[in-house]
Amino acid sequence: GNMRVVSLNENKEFILNPVGIEKFVTFSSWTLLMCLGYFLIAVINQTMMLLNINAISWLYSWQMVIFVAGISISFLTATVVRYIILPDEVKMGREHGHMFLFHEQIMHNFAAIFFAFEMLIVQPELQPNFAIFGLLFGILYISFAYQLAYFSSGYFVYSFLHPKPKIAPIFAVGLASSIALFYLGLWTITRFNNYNWLSWIIIIGWLSLIVQFRPTKSNHYNN
């Protein structure tokens, strides 16, 4: 669908319909890729185990790496959408019902829910130093966004990534660091797995604060 972007040269906002690889310029699309990638690899590994086929070690390694990055990115995405993007849309009086279409719900809400319950049910052995994977994926996304802007599309999907403002590098570093911080928060919750349902209560409470399934009404719409 259409999305608002910021041109590289003029630093002005305009609307376009991305095609091809440009569809993956949004952070939420990376959330979807992480979710699909993780569960695809998990199904492959589980099927091989059931069929008594020798495990492929690098597949198990990638499953863990993608899980760590995916759950961190999905929680960050849901938080940003609910507390930054949607309030801005309402403040500007924009119609934002498209943010609640099925594919958008998968990227903004259900990815975080799927990853969260996977963590609660499977209880993987997570380590605090795994936060580096989230940081690396953040750097990878930022590199992709700049590569696409300078050598292909000529635009950024997020204004804070535009190099013109002097504080742009701070926002870019902050994005990558936020992924790592979200992972550390989730890892901390896993320390309560042995305390009955405490980890479940905390995660479900956290999810309830970051997911949103219905548009926010504004005076603009009521008028």
Predicted regions: what they are:
Residues V19-T26, W58-Q63, K91-I106, P128-F133, ...:
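Non-cytosolic membrane-interface motifs at loop->transmembrane helix junctions
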Residues G1-T47, W62-V68:
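Early transmembrane hairpin module of multi-pass membrane proteins
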Residues I53-I73, P124-L136:
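Interfacial segments of alpha-helical transmembrane regions
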Residues F100-A112, P169-G174:
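Membrane-interface loop-to-helix entry segments
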Residues A111-L126, L148-F151, L181-T190:
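Alpha-helical transmembrane segments in multipass membrane proteins, preferentially the mid-helix core
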Residues C35-I41, N45, G70-I84, F110-F117, ...:
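Membrane-embedded alpha-helical transmembrane segments of multi-pass integral membrane proteins
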Residues N2-L16, L50-W58, E89-G97, I142, ...:
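Interhelical loop segments of eukaryotic multi-pass membrane proteins
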Residues V25-T26, S152-K217:
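Membrane-interface transmembrane-helix boundary segments in multi-pass integral membrane proteins
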